Amino acid sequence: MIDNCIANQASKEFSVSEISNKIKELLENNFGYIKVKGEISGLKRASSGHAYFNLKENTAILACTCWRPILAKIKFPLNDGMEVVIGGKLSSYSGNSRYQLSVDNLQPAGLGAMLQILNERKTRLEKEGLFNKKRIPIPFLPDKIGVITSITGAVIKDIIHRIRERFPTRIIIWQVSVQGENSGHEMAEAIEGFNNLEEIHKPSVIIVARGGGSIEDLWSFNDEILVRAAYNSKIPIISAVGHEADYTLIDLAADKRAPTPTAAAEFAVPVRSILNNTIQSYEKILFNNTNRLIKYHEQSIVNYDKIHSYFSYYINNRQQLLDEIGFNLLDVLIRFIALKETKIKSFSKERINYAKIINYKILELTHQTAYLFKSVNNTLKNFEYKLELNSTLLASLDYHNVLKRGFAIVKGDAGNFLSSKSAATNEQSLNIKFFDGEINVVLSCHDLNTRSN
């Protein structure tokens, strides 16, 4: 087409601007969107925000112009010597009679260049603290799980299958591209979208997943906007990118990293059967502990009976001792009075005028008698006080007083104590003890049905 155009214009005379415009037209019409791989050299940034550089390969050089809006979208710094792949359109610049490539898209080319960009970005984001946030714990039993991935691959099928196999839970899928120029933005918007849902629709945990691939395939998961979205998420995020050996920047910002998408599903939900076994084990432990507690209290009742018997015996002995002391004091008092009377009579028989002596002795006897009665009275009061204390203690330990307040002791066929309705269900008859006696009750089928209802 170019050859035909030149042949048709062979005899025509052009001005400088005409031939420049013609060349520009030929370039733009015959070369559409192209991709060129090369090494950046002579990079210059103008005050206007545009960037100018050459793309070279050996001795060949292609001038390139990167306008400010395009330059702002590039997420890594441009440097001389960096190998890149540039997409854009060819055009000519009439100011110096040269053609140039107008940049629409620029990506690093080669593993070395990509690793350099990755390390620089990782260092910068790490200094900002994006990888040192307080991790949000993954909920034990999430009611809803959000999954951000492509719906065309095997990843989503593996995740759904694994969750349904372990513990069926509602899954909300946010479809995104996991590879390509805008995939990082799509995944970041998905994270923000889940966080902005109403609480009733919001998932309890988010899984960001993709299958394995090369560093180029997984490059979107190193996108800065995606890393920041994961850092700012109020919902815990599980990253599951590639295989166990693959590592991306979102793994450092996520709340938990899974080596594979299937492992992410395992982190999100437990195994229902294992959970059921654990609950049954706890139920058995609770049942055994309850039985031990019942037996302990049954033994306590037996011990209280023994204590009651001991204190009854102790109080009876003290009462008997008190009675003996009372009898002895009375005998002593009678003998003392009789002795004094005998002395008085002997004085009268001898007709000796002992009036003063007798009066003195009578007064002395009166004082001694008063003292003796006071001493006996104090002793009796002391014993009565101790008896009252021991009786009060005995009454507090006597379970018969509890029965007088309306309680009863229920025993089964084997004489075992029954403390609950469910324990009485397996018994044929019951022995019920009240404070004033006990009765035996035979349970009928009607009683059992009524009790079950």
Curated annotation (Swiss-Prot):
The keyword Nuclease applies. Pfam families: Exonuc_VII_L, tRNA_anti_2. Keywords: Cytoplasm, Exonuclease, Hydrolase, Nuclease. GO terms for molecular function: exodeoxyribonuclease VII activity; nucleic acid binding. Its EC number is 3.1.11.6. Heterooligomer composed of large and small subunits. This is Exodeoxyribonuclease 7 large subunit.
